[in-house]
Amino acid sequence: MQFAKRLEKIPPYLFAEINRKREALIAKGVDIINIGVGDPDKPTPAHILQAMREAIDDASNHNYPPYEGTQEFREAAVEWMERRFGVMDLNPNTEVVSSIGSKEAIHNTFLAFVEAGDYTLIPDPGYPVYRTSTIFAGGEAFSMPLKAENKFLPDLDLIPEEVARKAKMLWINYPNNPTGALATLEFFEELVALCQQYSILLCHDHAYSEMAYDGYKPPSVLQIPGAKDIAIEFHSLSKSYNMTGWRIGFAVGNAYAIKGLSQVKTNVDSGVFKAIQKAAIAAYATDEVELQAVMSVYQSRRDIIVKGLQSLGWPIEPPKATLYVWVPVPPGYTSTEFTTLLLDKCGIVVPPGVGYGASGEGYFRVALTISDERLHEAIQRMQDAGIRYA
């Protein structure tokens, strides 16, 4: 028995490795503070749970769901896009498809459009799935470095002409994981123009669309005139509604891109449990006040981490979005060396920036997914261990 050769090209999945290391230390009796994985610790809101309970009791939801999602779910997604972003004229029958979270839809989009020898343009640092899915599809990933001096936006002028001509997809993710960076509508306009020029499918991973603070409201790339000609956007309920375990989201945008994604999906999965789709519909109807109450929890945690690290000399500012704080390592350390130091001396688990790509070197990521008390304790442990930025 032998693995396929493609698996030899796949590095260990970052978060799985972090979890294994954490479990090994816990087995030894170490009190671990895990701020390494973006998995919200709060419960799913009560009205969503109630919608799920009612849907489970309805026997009509117990059979196979439509591959593309129920009509009711797709219409709710379209209505939410209109209400949230002002994106009008989306067709729920041809321009929306349900997904098992956004991760599977992202991966299956690579399978639908990338062939051997094709380039994918991916952010670096970035969600590891962009690179591994390129490998699974037989393509070649071209990294677009995200640098602090460019506000963690890719410099589109650095994409060589020969690469752009062979590129099938360009991936972006704003608000950004892991950097917490933001993108403007003006930047989206530049992306749309580039992708139109080279007939590249523009793919926007919008998993953190609602994870924003200080009054900021992240835009959709589909707000740009003409974007729907070349763009697909991926939405997930996982982070915004504390529903990571539910596995529900949708892809929306260009009808041809949705058709390709749907064709892969109909051959590899059987859709999302209809009761979960009912719960998702309730989630998209969540009152803005209630959603902001959820966000206020993460904003408080952000402030604890930022102020705590600032007190230890870190030159950082509070991010306006996502579940993460992107933090430079102290001078003289690599990201792996410093995160190992935090684990060994403080029992704190954080991922090294290099795990998100070569351009992530020099940083580590803090996830705002544990209680205020444990975040304060993490800062105290660092202080007690004499760990400072400089």
UniProtKB/Swiss-Prot annotation:
UniProt catalytic activity: (2S,6S)-2,6-diaminopimelate + 2-oxoglutarate = (S)-2,3,4,5-tetrahydrodipicolinate + L-glutamate + H2O + H(+)
Pathway where it operates: Amino-acid biosynthesis; L-lysine biosynthesis via DAP pathway; LL-2,6-diaminopimelate from (S)-tetrahydrodipicolinate (aminotransferase route): step 1/1
Keyword presence, Transferase: yes
Cysteine pairings via disulfide bonds: none
Biological process per Gene Ontology, one example term: lysine biosynthetic process via diaminopimelate, diaminopimelate-aminotransferase pathway
Cofactor list: pyridoxal 5'-phosphate
GO MF terms held by the record: L,L-diaminopimelate aminotransferase activity; pyridoxal phosphate binding
PANTHER family documented for this protein: AMINO ACID AMINOTRANSFERASE, L-GLUTAMINE--4-(METHYLSULFANYL)-2-OXOBUTANOATE AMINOTRANSFERASE
Function of the molecule: Involved in the synthesis of meso-diaminopimelate (m-DAP or DL-DAP), required for both lysine and peptidoglycan biosynthesis. Catalyzes the direct conversion of tetrahydrodipicolinate to LL-diaminopimelate.
Protein name: LL-diaminopimelate aminotransferase 2
Provenance organism: Nostoc sp. (strain PCC 7120 / SAG 25.82 / UTEX 2576)
